């Protein structure tokens, strides 16, 4: 049986090209010549062309999931016609760097959240799940993307664990990275966070870089805080991009060094407003990415469409803004048949009300109305195992240990005098080693009860913040039963919970259900005096 475009859309450019036959392309040519009817005809659109930076009136004819012809008043017929009535037709939006796990959603649920906002493809950086499960996590992410309705590509995580001080569920070496890079749909090496290892000549890091170079694919960068000679040396190592610039000066320095500029705007870091002046002047070797974005923000604010609104409000020409999420991420990642509405390209496009608010009327993937996929495939392993000694555990830290000082709305911490804390923080190994450590904290505001979570970047151990040993133990066991997630325990009872049974990081529930559960846990924690920020 010949696969449909929806069956193939997950596979990536190389897999789709292998599955395509001469007959498919010959039919596309016949449709383009008017010798055969197409499958879809979009009449009367204002087509956004990011390559030439223009908007022009045209019809778009589609056959076999690809664009056959684009032009004004096409003398063409198709099995189905959509009347655009002057609405704008832009290429489908591409998020060039995102950790899907940070949304708390599986790929299918994530697709349900972003397809209505015009996103048709993402390049997932799955180092969260790979820290839990190793390369099997990347395999699962790609497999789960196959039926999601979204084109899910990936990059191969380069830093698992993120540092030598972390102990997670996996250690990934250069040979495993090379295997991941060889898989269809893997577009390059994921962000090389270990820049000290790059600059210091660490043998393991350079073996991984060499695996990336041998693959002939992209080497994604992560150069937080680097400048001057160090940034030049990092670029000289062969990295191609960076998404850590926070100031216009840093952004320009990266562009001068030959790096592609990924401008990050998500839930954890928001750099777009600061970098808009650079995008206005130098919009060509740049792309917009979300990096980490939470489910509640996806539902409330949107995805790449909200970044486009910010760009246009900040003075970018709409075609320049659209290029940042279409042709330019496609060019960077080598997705040569995405990002433009042109003959031979995949028929991924978005019908928009206007080019100021970017309200989405309809999203098309492979020439069909986008529809989120079906069931999420099972994921063996990746749960929580605190070990048999947990039930008798006590969590008082040594008296001379310093207290961890927390600050409202900050991710930085400080030190306070020993014995000055108001709640204990326990970090417990979730991978069956039966280990844990604890310290006192000051500034959490928590009055009674315990918060527990299995999301702890990047090793994703279990973190518990609370008072009594009994509640700390109960919260840990609750996370075990759920297979991971977020819980709030008071007097030994679970008051609120968000199960995340996929690697302790994701749920396959509908986005609205996941956001509601997250909201209930957060609200309950605030009632107990704790003021969790973001995703707790």
From Swiss-Prot:
Record EC number: 3.5.4.2
One term of GO molecular function: adenine deaminase activity
Lineage: Bacteria, Thermotogati, Deinococcota, Deinococci, Deinococcales
Family membership: Belongs to the metallo-dependent hydrolases superfamily. Adenine deaminase family.
Cofactors (names): Mn(2+)
Protein name: Adenine deaminase
Catalytic activity line of the entry: adenine + H2O + H(+) = hypoxanthine + NH4(+)
Region annotation Disordered: where it falls in the sequence: 1-24
The gene coding this protein: ade
HAMAP family per record: Adenine_deamin
Keywords assigned: Hydrolase, Manganese
GO biological process terms, semicolon-separated: adenine catabolic process
Keyword Manganese: yes
UniProt keyword 4Fe-4S present: no
Short name of any one Pfam family annotated for the protein: Amidohydro_1
